[in-house]
Amino acid sequence: MPCCSHRSCREDPGTSESREMDPVAFEDVAVNFTQEEWTLLDISQKNLFREVMLETFRNLTSIGKKWSDQNIEYEYQNPRRSFRSLIEEKVNEIKEDSHCGETFTQVPDDRLNFQEKKASPEVKSCDSFVCAEVGIGNSSFNMSIRGDTGHKAYEYQEYGPKPYKCQQPKNKKAFRYRPSIRTQERDHTGEKPYACKVCGKTFIFHSSIRRHMVMHSGDGTYKCKFCGKAFHSFSLYLIHERTHTGEKPYECKQCGKSFTYSATLQIHERTHTGEKPYECSKCDKAFHSSSSYHRHERSHMGEKPYQCKECGKAFAYTSSLRRHERTHSGKKPYECKQYGEGLSYLISFQTHIRMNSGERPYKCKICGKGFYSAKSFQTHEKTHTGEKRYKCKQCGKAFNLSSSFRYHERIHTGEKPYECKQCGKAFRSASQLRVHGGTHTGEKPYECKECGKAFRSTSHLRVHGRTHTGEKPYECKECGKAFRYVKHLQIHERTEKHIRMPSGERPYKCSICEKGFYSAKSFQTHEKTHTGEKPYECNQCGKAFRCCNSLRYHERTHTGEKPYECKQCGKAFRSASHLRMHERTHTGEKPYECKQCGKAFSCASNLRKHGRTHTGEKPYECKQCGKAFRSASNLQMHERTHTGEKPYECKECEKAFCKFSSFQIHERKHRGEKPYECKHCGNGFTSAKILQIHARTHIGEKHYECKECGKAFNYFSSLHIHARTHMGEKPYECKDCGKAFS
């Protein structure tokens, strides 16, 4: 064999020239495909391959002469050009540029067939990298040249019968060999018989799993400096590196969104054009990408080949199994630097970041509402269309989302697959388990900026925020009542009251006072006013209540908690209803009007109480003295005259009161506060009632008349004293002389 005279063979490895020309074999930097694999690639995948190979050619410096970009583009744009002449031309270029002295014979026609995988025996080997690079029969070299712009790989071969046809109705491809048709059919069935033992990923081709295993073994020539993964080809290494650098060189011209791969961009562009080339033969549903189509096919087959070793749950995809396994391992690879919170899924992490920044990139065209994630936006869109695809077979209830439907089904089955490792308590959803976990750790990482209250989850913090903003985004279409939580709206819509309100029907009648009610629940609560049943007891003072809401409200009198604050004057209240009523003092709104006298009220309860002044109804009767009252609150205050209970104590003078209103008036005396001023004389008073009584002295009005003599008085107390003169009653006696006075 003649001595190789190429300069890279002759020069000393230590010279500067040899250091500059660091040899790289083309088979190391090219992606290797078999013919069967190539025929299964779609146009976008072939174009991606073409771009990668172009980049590889441009960067390749192992051959003494650079390959012209212009020529490369020309080869790709002319796929029908003679493959034989193309190979011979490249061989001649290399021969002319090198001086290795090797001879090359003409390559026979059958050696230029794509199925050939070994170099032609007529091509003599050479120890120099230039000769090794020729590799005419090598599939890596062949494939590097035959990238196309949309033409099928087999268009390069114009000869030979193709007896094997694909049986799929929408695929008319034909093949020369039976293995090729079997491989093609896997693309339709989704069959991937080759599974990786390390990560579980599956492949259609045996060659694909061999390439994939290089990443795990670390035997690849090109190792990633970020994660240590190894690759057998330089092009795959470059593409992988983008996952770390975040480089997205392919940008959508319509919306500006960027992508790591050109194939992904092409799939994305279909969302703008509406093109869905992959159609399901069973339900006619169409998809943008082949991967989405294959995933959908499994929904018809019911196939779930990937099973969790911990709980036995099965999944249709390996990615779903991997995500599920994190619920058992507790692994949270995505960490928020701002709050230090770990998240199991990338999509959850991205949504979490947007929630903290306030970014809502998904806008509803109908109502303008913004959303943090595409999934939330898609769910919201269904509220406008009314679409509910998932229907429960047991109760007929329908849902927008499959996840909501699955969660609902567990109510019927009683299934609670998420179990707390500390206390054994089980839950229907992973999110419920995560929130519950905070009860053991005591961790509440989400703090309200308004009041400092902390919560276990961001959703709880968001919902709490509405108590400060007063936001009630969920409104009943029937009665207009608004709610802070969608759950409360759903409960409201299911109530009998809501159903019967339009007709005015009140089928539940009290046998004692004959009052009517829309719902059984309201009726049962009312019955307790007659029976005196109070099952909810305060742990601090022992006071009992008819319903748990009343107990919760009462407990705030002990804690002093007033979470509902007026934005106009800063006054705080124990309940949202009290805040709403108070806000009407600023707006002057009085929506509840008496039909008999036209008097208006700021709250419904005051209208109801007022209505009894017309009817004379007093349904609340004292069991000790038989005295009756128009409202339950008046009865409760009266009962304290029998029990002697005075729960409201002044901290200044320790005087106690049975009524909260009396306690408030008393406190004003200590502060010197007199907010009610007389328009006639300018005098100030501690309460509105005292002002009303005083006003009578100016207008001469005397409401209280003696039935015995007809004398009239401004005040009830004056009439009461006067009445004693008729009865001869003198309750006040002097201790010194014994004289009595009325």
Curated annotation (Swiss-Prot):
SUPFAM superfamilies the UniProt entry points to: beta-beta-alpha zinc fingers, KRAB domain (Kruppel-associated box)
GO cellular component entries: nucleus
GO biological process, one term: regulation of transcription by RNA polymerase II
Positions of region (Disordered): 1-20
One function term, GO molecular function aspect: RNA polymerase II transcription regulatory region sequence-specific DNA binding
Entry keywords, A to Z: DNA-binding, Metal-binding, Nucleus, Repeat, Transcription, Transcription regulation, Zinc, Zinc-finger
CDD domains linked to this entry: KRAB_A-box
Record gene name: ZNF700
Major site of localization recorded for this protein: nucleus
Amino acid composition bias (Basic and acidic residues), ranges on this chain: 8-20
Function: May be involved in transcriptional regulation.
Official protein name in the record: Zinc finger protein 700
Cystine bridges: none
Pfam families recorded: KRAB, zf-C2H2
Top-level lineage group: Eukaryota
Residue ranges constituting the KRAB domain according to the UniProt record: 24-104
Family, similarity comment: Belongs to the krueppel C2H2-type zinc-finger protein family.
PROSITE patterns: KRAB, ZINC_FINGER_C2H2_1, ZINC_FINGER_C2H2_2
Zinc finger (C2H2-type): 194-216, 222-244, 250-272, 278-300, 306-328, 362-384, 390-412, 418-440, 446-468, 474-502, 508-530, 536-558, 564-586, 592-614, 620-642, 648-670, 676-698, 704-726
Compartments (UniProt record): Nucleus
SMART domains: KRAB, ZnF_C2H2
